[in-house]
Amino acid sequence: MATRVDRPPTQAGVLILLLVGFLVPVCVSAQQAIIPLQLSFSDPGARSMGFGGAFVALADDATAAFANPAGLVQLLRPEISIEARSWNYSTPYTEGGRAEGLPSGLGIDSTVGLRTSTSDYDATALSFLSVAYPKDNLSLALYRHVYANLEFYGETQGLFAGGSDCCYIRYYDQQMASQLDFVAYGLSGAYRVGDRFDIGLGVVYNDASLSASTTQYSSDEDTTESYFSPNSYLPSRTVTTQRQFVDDSDWTLTVGFLWRLSERLRFGGVYRQGAEVKVGTEETAGELIDLGVPPGGVLYRATGIPIEFPDIYGFGIAYQSPDGGLTVSFQWNRVEYSDIPASLELDDQTIDDADELHLGAEYIFLSSTPIIAVRLGTWLEPDHQMRATVDDPYTRALLQPGDDEIHYSAGLGLATQRFQVDLAMDFADRVDTFSLSAIYNF
């Protein structure tokens, strides 16, 4: 909603919580909320990260339980794997500016086009833990993997439209916050079918927790000066608050294979089913406008809204040099982000499926003690922000297409007969990731 003003202003706005990386929209009443979620579908382990995520055709340690369960059958001894990760998020969102038209030049309505800002958040967590046990042609593994650990906070200040004829429009300013935790627990198994072919299957329990809120504020006073001034977010000027919440789980499947084409060349693939969870939402009244209920009273509540997370297909090929020192690996992932708007039956916004390309290399100094490995990698993360498919200026202002990102990674590993330690870094515009992992076999 928006109201126009001839010079003395009255306001209205639209409730919307902004776009980043990976987004889940929830339609509520005549308004719309978009919750920023930044999920990582990268494989666990610092070794995989050093390869730029090109690991599905290798999958030769306990992290294969997630990356490609077929790889577990390559293990010679039981293994315990543990990983800690640190994430430095920089989540972009539209802060204000012009949804359409030229600025009036009054107060904060002075920007041609849109203003953007970022929500910065740092997190550290035990991101992966697994235990793998091989026996003859069969291997089993249990694991825990963190998909997401993210908090977001943002404020809008003065998103305007109109002004070409008689009227200026200022949408409601908003304070937005969300917290997301998404963890997977899995049991994976692998079986050696023949000398050259392995298959794997995983059963995954996905546990999702989300808390998000957006509060709309009118300008501080009903004056022209205040209409074009920064918002102080006064409690007495709140219009509505909308909350979204998830506390749900789902069971999914993972299947994979490894095919040794020759002694030096191998081909692998994996399919990972996306989870479906239920979202609840409610809208409550603020203090400014009489909406028929007291401030804090519920205007709308709904539960059980299904959201499907993407299915993922991955195929890769890896080559090892005759002396075993150099390994080069390539992987293609298809991430079906369009499952999200399709599950919500949205017709005014969409997300494109993404074709990720991963490339990495490892060189091992075989004569060193302990054995030292260095790794370099890169991968393409295509744009997968929710974008508007309608001509409404406000929706288009907040649901803008994003940019493709190139990630660059590097890693270092030390290995003895029983113990392996790996360190890796992955750098991109929206998130930098650091990983430290260890594997012990016994």
Question: Predicted regions: what is each one?
Answer:
Residues 1-9:
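N-terminal secretory signal peptides that target proteins for export/translocation
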